[in-house]
Amino acid sequence: MSDRQQVTNAKGERIAIVAGLRTPFAKQATAFHGVSALDMGKMVVNELLARSELDPKLIEQLVYGQVVQMPAAPNIAREIVLGTGMNVSTDAYSVTRACATSFQSTVNVAESIMTGNIDIGIAGGADSSSVLPIGVSKKLAHALVDLNKARSFGQKLQIFRRLGLKDLLPVPPAVAEYSTGLSMGQTAEQMAKTYNISRADQDALAHRSHTLASETWASGHLRDEVMVAHIPPYKQFIDRDNNIRENSVLESYAKLRPAFDKQHGTVTAANSTPLTDGASAIILMSEGRAKALGYQPIGYIKSYAFSAIDVWQDMLMGPSYATPLALKRAGMELEDLTLIEMHEAFAAQTLANMQMFASKKFAEEKLGRNRPIGEIDMSKFNVLGGSLAYGHPFAATGTRLITQVCRELKRRGGGTGLTTACAAGGLGVAMIVEVE
């Protein structure tokens, strides 16, 4: 049995990435303050349909995701269908895979096309760190349920007497892993220490990311893949990412204090991604349907793979596990790739994965391979800057990476590109795209 992955439908047609778009990415509580993930999702899907001149009624499936869930609209995908002029019978469901969420939605739509169930679908994701589901304490939640059953004033008074002042305080969403209590920042700190990644190297990678992202915006390359977002009540707009450090100076990074290990740490706010708001989406079609409708795809999915590892140690090493699987399924080696796009959750996590790509010991002990994945050529790596600069709305990053690498490959005359990311819960993803 061949190890090669056949990302085609029954007719042998490839899965075409027809178009992609995202909102600008904005730091928490700035341009998108008060705008929900759902509203950003509707915003970007509406604009994507308008720009592609695709009749919304032709969309057969929409798979969308978010990580920070909205209790009022748990199925964000269905709400987007109902809010963007698509046929009400359009299949729609929501997914979540932490920072790999829109990779998952992309794969789900692609697999629906591969099985022949649909020919056209939309995938993507959105997240807001500014509109959060603020909860209540367990004691208050328990009391509120009991209040619904209490009949007399005396019974209600007895319930209130069980509560202390601290029980009334709001509870923000958790930033730590449910199973370990560790935050991703703490894991990044652990990886920096385990693999001897210096503060200087982390700051240098962050500086590189911001510098390249700033140059990319100045070149105009992102104008066709980032929409102008008009913010309700439509008196303001945002037309570019607002986390990028223009005229980044390497020496300035050293001024920041460690964020997670105050005494001995090296992970800072400057070499980590900030909490970010934003949304992204892509249109997928069977190759034949895209051709029939007159579209020139920006790329095709060649292979993909997901991975899962332990959450106590090296939780953010997902790219090092998923990438060799995707390469094997594509029949490729790392050196065959034209471009490599790795999600930069933290500089420490990114550098640790790059180190493991080149490690024979890691390949033998963790992957069961007799040779390393390969040493990354920096002339191919995150050439437009990465998440450290652009920001990271959790569910939106995957389809940002896919669109960005496809369009950059198109500018370069074609080739193949790897997109890969770590995700909370010890998850990882890698997807290889090809562009003609």
Swiss-Prot record:
Pathway: Lipid metabolism; fatty acid beta-oxidation. HAMAP family: FadI (MF_01618). The keyword NADP does not apply. CDD domains: thiolase (cd00751). It catalyses: an acyl-CoA + acetyl-CoA = a 3-oxoacyl-CoA + CoA. The lineage of its organism: Bacteria, Pseudomonadati, Pseudomonadota, Gammaproteobacteria, Alteromonadales. GO terms for molecular function: acetyl-CoA C-acyltransferase activity. Heterotetramer of two alpha chains (FadJ) and two beta chains (FadI). It is found in: Cytoplasm. This is 3-ketoacyl-CoA thiolase. Pfam families: Thiolase_C (PF02803), Thiolase_N (PF00108). The keyword Cytoplasm applies. The gene is fadI. SUPFAM superfamilies: Thiolase-like. It comes from the Bacteria. It comes from Shewanella sp. (strain W3-18-1).
